């Protein structure tokens, strides 16, 4: 009995041990499988996350490229549309400018006005502004070096009443507005309008209207035959009526005689401007009438005595009648324009004859340069085909820059215009 029990106990223990070992073994093997599965799952999850991340990066990159390409395309389309609109705008503006140029009227300031000739270089070139300012100073009779000039200089026209009389300054400003073709009250047709200076005799005299209209065409660079010529071309102002009208040719020839100081009558000396008052002058009341009209305009006197607000008569100030100095200088200008000098035999400093030097008769070069001025005034250029016909600067030939002689003669003309002569005392 004891032995059997012992053997039973032993066998039971062994079986229990075996059962315990088998359980542990299965448990450990299950854990290993679970660990392996977890590792596989984590590795798979890691790879899946990496793949998802890579695809996300690729998607973001492609999306960025697409957005950039879309924006670039929009910018390119906008730039193309903008350039096309600008080109169409420039083309339209050019067409409108040409159309407005051809429809220019006296009462409007269109692109045919000389203001259109003030190029971009105006704002960029202080030298050009300086010289224009000098001209403005001359027109306004102001000279910073007035004490250094002679009494025959236009600076002598700066009267005491000038500084004290705002009315005179106002009227000089009107002249400046007229010369610059700018009128702040243009639509109102006020006294600043040059049309106001066309007196009653203008409407009654078709001959005078014709000649004034020619001058107006020249000053405004407009041509009724505009379609045949370029609208900006001063040459277009030499109209068909010029060649067909001997009356107008005669008057222009008189001006040419005055500028060149030559007399076809050969009665006077060729250097004497008095010789330019030809026999036809005294015999032709028509020409005398037109010169008298110019004198009336320059002296601001009108035989009609209407004294309209637009009339230059408004410029006759109280100081004018009271100041003999101003009257004297205006009379000097009248003498110069009419080429008559009461002191001719004395050869005074106010006499233009004193400015015609001895070299004038002996120097054919001077005559050549005066002819250049005549070409400029008549808007004709012998070298027109070589230069741009619309460009007045094209009349300043290459010889200008290379020829100091020409500069000297131009200075002589400047002296004449300013009524100062470096050889005045020796005349």
UniProtKB/Swiss-Prot annotation:
The keyword Repeat applies. Keywords: Malaria, Repeat. PROSITE patterns: GBP. Pfam families: GBP_repeat (PF02526). The keyword Repeat applies. P.falciparum undergoes three cycles of development in its vertebrate host: the hepatic cycle; the asexual blood cycle, which includes the extracellular merozoite and the intraerythrocytic schizont; and the sexual gametocyte cycle. This is Glycophorin-binding protein-related antigen. The gene is GBPH.
């Amino acid at each position: 009995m004891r032995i059997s029990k012992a053997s039973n106990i032993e066998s039971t223990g062994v079986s229990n041990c075996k059962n315990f070992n088998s359980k542990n073994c299965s448990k450990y093997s299950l854990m290993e499988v679970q660990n392996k599965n977890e590792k596989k799952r984590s590795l798979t999850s890691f790879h899946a996350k990496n793949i998802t991340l890579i695809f996300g990066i690729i998607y973001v990159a492609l999306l960025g490229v697409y957005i950039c390409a879309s924006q670039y395309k929009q910018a390119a389309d906008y730039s193309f549309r903008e350039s096309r609109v600008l080109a169409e705008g420039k083309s339209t503006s050019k067409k409108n400018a040409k159309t407005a140029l051809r429809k220019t009227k006296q009462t409007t300031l269109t692109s045919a006005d000389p203001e259109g000739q003030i190029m971009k270089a105006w704002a960029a070139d202080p030298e050009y502004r300086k010289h224009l300012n000098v001209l403005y100073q001359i027109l306004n009779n102001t000279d910073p070096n007035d004490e250094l000039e002679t009494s025959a200089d236009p600076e002598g026209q700066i009267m005491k009443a000038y500084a004290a009389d705002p009315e005179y300054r106002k009227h000089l400003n009107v002249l400046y507005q007229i010369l610059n073709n700018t009128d702040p009250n243009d639509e109102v047709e006020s006294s600043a309008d040059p049309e106001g200076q066309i007196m009653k005799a203008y409407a009654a005299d078709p001959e005078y209207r014709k000649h004034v209209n020619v001058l107006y065409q020249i000053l405004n660079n407009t041509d009724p035959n505009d379609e045949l010529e370029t609208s900006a071309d001063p040459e277009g102002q030499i109209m068909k009526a010029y060649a067909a009208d001997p009356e107008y040719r005669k008057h222009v020839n008189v001006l040419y005689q005055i500028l060149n100081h030559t007399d076809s009558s050969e009665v006077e000396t060729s250097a004497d401007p008095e010789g330019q008052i030809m026999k036809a002058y005294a015999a032709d009341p028509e020409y005398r009438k037109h010169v008298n009209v110019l004198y009336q305009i320059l002296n601001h006197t009108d035989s009609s005595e209407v004294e309209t607000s637009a009339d230059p008569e408004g410029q006759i100030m109280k100081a004018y009648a009271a100041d003999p100095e101003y009257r004297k200088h205006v009379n000097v200008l009248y003498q110069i324009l009419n080429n008559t000098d009461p002191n001719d035999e004395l050869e005074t400093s106010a006499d233009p004859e004193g400015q015609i030097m001895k070299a004038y008769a002996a120097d054919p070069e001077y005559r050549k340069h005066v002819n250049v001025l005549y070409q400029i005034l008549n808007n004709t250029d012998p070298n027109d085909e070589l230069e741009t016909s619309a460009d007045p600067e094209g009349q300043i030939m290459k010889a200008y820059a290379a020829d100091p002689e020409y500069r000297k003669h131009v200075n002589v003309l400047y002296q004449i215009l300013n009524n100062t002569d470096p050889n005045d005392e020796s005349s």
